[in-house]
Amino acid sequence: MKLIPGILIIALFLCGCGPSEDDVRTIVANELANASARSEVTNAEVIGPYSPAVRIGNLLFVSGQIGLDPATGQLAGPEIEAQTQQALRNLGSVLSGTGFDSSHVVQCTVYLKDMNDFQRMNLIYGGYFQEGHYPARTTVEVSNLPRNAIIEIAAIAFKST
């Protein structure tokens, strides 16, 4: 049997068409154990005691990004479209500061305060990634978000060396 790169197996699992959860846990544990270094990204502002992203080997775990405009310290606007665009710009800023870009994103988690905003968020979100190369995604409705934001987007990216 050919050795399949760990990230491919993880992606297949996230899509529901791959190995079992135990297999994925083993692969992730091996990836983390074999990672040469763990580094915290500090090139972006945060609003709490956490890193904007943590890199372990070829994986980059990006903390949730809200629609906070770094120039003003305020939310980009009250509408889902404006906050989604800004959250994605913030995600892009963290990615580019680490040598990654949107093409490296393999999974996103989107938190919405109101699932009725899903379609409008989806129009903006879909334009951020190259068509046909969308990451796996989970979208959940939550009761509240930091700074009373209406969307937060977290991501995992992979970049081969």
For each of these PLM feature ranges, what is it?
Residues K2-I9:
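Sec-dependent signal peptide recognition
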Residues L14-G16:
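C-terminal motif of bacterial Sec signal peptides marking the signal peptidase cleavage site
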Residues G18-R89, S93-V106, L112-T161:
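N-terminal presequence-like segments and the immediate start of the first folded domain
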